[in-house]
């Protein structure tokens, strides 16, 4: 559905997006995850035709966003980080304007307006001035305009930023509902949000794609999945002697507890936690010692995110680039209004 190849965006010497390549398939919900200033908004603005790349291509259902902008943009509904709303209008007036700008008219426009108003839950406020609406309702109106024109792909940039907890839950539920009939891509830096909604996760850091997979697969791949904590009454030197004889262990650290037990955190070279656990029980038993408790630590999306983004930070040139990246990220997110073919 969407093919991004070798996408790069420079602002002078600063690289906001660095050689991004990925493919988005039909009918799934994708989370675009990264810290502030990572390049998420810049990438989304390029994908939607609001910003030109320095190099690289974006194709929407086979249509190049630069060479065939009208055909490509007809397939996209976009909500920028700052919703492009006209606050002197009512939601109904605003949606009529957007629909006509997208080439939808007459009975079909009214049908689509009725549908998106129902879907986004703004029927009760459709005749109030947008300037009087809460942040949550403004986000809903922004999503409603993205849905006009019957696009196949919905792209949402930080759709829950600035909302209260109830509004966040409502927008998340709306995204799940949209995912039943559309391909949805939304950006966030909130890990729990991405984990609870998305079927696929793209993690971007310093403008580079560092991971792209299902959340569950990412969790399985990273370090904490090979971490085991053992609780025992054996002495620390005895534990060291036992663990040195267990194959497949890379490192361990012992901590004395108030009840006289020893807590031992063990990092394994293999991710086969069952096999490592079996070896540990056997080794302790053979030495006449007992394992009172054994816990396998499973990675979550937060572990994956921190490890990947910290690796990128170590290669960064310094905090000045971070600030510059945020400045360009914010600037690029302001460059787009309503997408009109």
Give residue ranges: language-model regions.
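Hydrophobic/anchoring residues in structured secondary elements
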Residues: 9, 254-257, 296
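A generic structural signal for secondary-structure junctions
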Residues: 77, 103, 142, 202, ...
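ABC transporter nucleotide-binding domain
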Residues: 173-269
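C-terminal coupling/interaction segments
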Residues: 268-341
């Amino acid at each position: 559905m969407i093919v991004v190849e070798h996408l790069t965006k420079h602002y002078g010497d600063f690289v906001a997006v660095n050689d991004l390549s990925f493919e988005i398939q039909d009918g799934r919900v994708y989370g675009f995850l990264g810290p502030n200033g990572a390049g998420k908004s810049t990438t989304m603005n390029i994908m939607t035709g609001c910003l030109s790349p320095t190099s690289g291509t974006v194709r929407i259902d086979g249509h190049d966003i630069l060479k065939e902008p009208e055909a490509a943009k007809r397939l996209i509904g976009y909500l920028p980080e700052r919703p492009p709303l006209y606050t002197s209008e009512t939601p109904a007036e605003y949606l009529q304007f957007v629909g006509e700008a997208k080439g939808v008219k007459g009975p079909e426009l009214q049908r689509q307006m009725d549908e998106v108003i129902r879907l986004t839950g703004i029927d009760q406020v459709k005749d109030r001035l947008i300037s009087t609406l809460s942040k949550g309702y403004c986000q809903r109106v922004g999503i409603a305009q993205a849905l006009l024109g019957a696009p196949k792909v919905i792209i949402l940039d930080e759709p829950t930023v600035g909302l209260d907890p109830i509004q966040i839950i409502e927008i998340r539920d709306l995204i799940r509902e949209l995912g039943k009939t559309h391909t949805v891509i939304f950006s966030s830096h909130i890990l729990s949000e991405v984990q609870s909604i998305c079927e696929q996760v793209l993690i971007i850091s310093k403008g580079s794609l560092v991971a792209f997979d299902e959340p569950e697969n990412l969790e399985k791949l990273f370090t904490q999945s090979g971490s085991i904590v053992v609780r025992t009454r054996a002495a620390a030197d005895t534990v060291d002697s036992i663990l040195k004889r267990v194959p497949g262990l890379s490192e361990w650290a012992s901590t004395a507890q108030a009840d006289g037990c020893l807590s031992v955190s063990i990092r394994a070279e293999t991710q086969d936690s069952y096999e490592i656990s079996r070896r540990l029980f056997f080794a302790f038993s053979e030495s006449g010692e007992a394992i009172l408790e054994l816990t396998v630590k499973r990675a979550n999306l937060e572990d994956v995110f921190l490890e990947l983004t910290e690796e990128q930070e170590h290669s960064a040139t310094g905090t000045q680039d971070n600030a510059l990246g945020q400045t360009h990220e914010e600037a690029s997110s302001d460059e787009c209004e309503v997408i009109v073919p």
